[in-house]
From Swiss-Prot:
The gene is argS. Belongs to the class-I aminoacyl-tRNA synthetase family. HAMAP family: Arg_tRNA_synth. This is Arginine--tRNA ligase. It is an enzyme of class 6 (ligase). Keywords: Aminoacyl-tRNA synthetase, ATP-binding, Cytoplasm, Ligase, Nucleotide-binding, Protein biosynthesis.
Amino acid sequence: MELLIKQISAFVEDVFEQKGYDKKYGMVTVSDRPDLCQFQCNGALPAAKEYKKAPIQIANDLLPALKNVEIFEEITIAGPGFININVKDSFLAAYVNEMYGSEKLGLEEPAEPQTIIIDYGGANVAKPLHVGHLRAAIIGESLKRISRFVGHKVIGDVHLGDWGLQMGMVISELRRRSPHLPYFDESYEGEYPAEAPFTIDELEDIYPAASKLAKSDAAAMEEAQQATAELQKGRRGYMALWQHILNVSVADLKKGYGNLNVDFDLWNGESDCQKYIDVMVDYLKKNNYTSFSDGLLIVDVAKETDNHVIPPFIVLKTDGSSLYSTTDLATIWERVQDYDPDQIIYVVDKRQELHFEQVFRCAKKTKIAGEDLTLKFLGFGTMNGKDGKPFKTREGGVMRLQDLIQIIKDAVYNKLQENEAIDPSEVDEISRKVGLAALKYGDLSNQITKDYVFDIDRFASFEGNTGPYILYTIVRIKSILRRIAAEGFQASDKIGVPHSDVERSLLLKLSRFNETVEFSFVNHSPNRICDYIYDLANTFNKFYHDTKIISETEFEKKSSWINLITLTMNVLETCLELLGIEAPEKM
């Protein structure tokens, strides 16, 4: 179904056209003064310049015809020529009823669905997830869900760091600890063990030990570099060992991301694009895109219009080996070959902006990415502690993600234990859901590009613009519906016209659901959904306090209210689903 705001705009545009004005001036927006009106059209002001008339004259020209539009309850002119609009309750109720009867709450499918790849996650194998992985994971997951809900084909790719020097470090450290393993015997020709010679806990101890040693011992660094080179040349034992590292790590990462309610369609990594690098480099050379600078193979990506220096894109190092930039470009090559996407969106730390600017420019200049392919960098800000610095443990180290999740779960658990109405056996699971909502909502309610402060007391609060408050509102509605069901009341399937200002306000808020989702998709802004559901929850709670739903004796009125709060619950839960948040049945 068409957006409510577009339907209203169409009527106003027709009136502009009827009166001899360009219809483009008839665009309607939601009123920024809801105390004065529901919607407004400011088109008379810009039209005044074109038609050499005062805005108030244009607005008055339109007024009689606007008052005759069947869906409008009231039209007034304010200030220099603002057109204030209130719609009829019957029109509003009809729109909301159509939402109520629709599987996707009235959202229109796109005429031409796109294929969109979202690159988020970015975890490294052999390392545990830490707080630095939080934002990419939950922002990317939300964008994936929003895009998919809107109707596009969306592919989420974790893009693991599973290649390069870190692998050589791990292999070298394993060799020092267990030199007897067959993976290190170049004369070994048998089958390698199916089971990895280490657990995830051992693996997570091996990498930091190897990294620390390599930084302080030149010989150890040389060993790691040699192991990396042999792995990348396909040494049989090292490849088998690398596969073990990958398998053990991915199993643990899936568990870690699962605890965040995050999943991926592709578990690809840097290693997956390696087979494309030689072909890609040959293509770049044959088409004269490359040159040499101080032994480096580069592509010049600077433009005359640049107001700051954009360094050349490095394809290969002096020894002919690849870099992160090479694998990122080869990954675009791979994705174009395999999926022919319309968009590739990268959800990464905003401090990587220059790197991706170089990658995107190179991909476009060399035609690896065609004109129709949109490459989008979505750089996110930092999660900081109360001191304004990147969030750390008390000891100053990087906190594991599972520890952060546990901290906020415990904070919620302590609050829920005070509620004697909750079965003690359910408190743990409810705490998990509410804690995760507190964490994810606290993050997603901020603009992606902004830094924010992780404030556990504020995030876990059951009041204000928080995840627990939204969940509590949903649980309140579920409780009402359970009580009504226990009465045996059978409601009709219709939402009637509103009986009060707050009920009308609730219908208006519900009618903005599709507009909000579409805006969030186009602008990559989950925070807009957070703003919307906080506003909707507040409006519902005012309606709840002012309306005696359960004790109402008039059938049609009670039925309408039951359907209205059911739709409110469905909209809230759908929005939470788009944010990757689950709602419990009780709190």
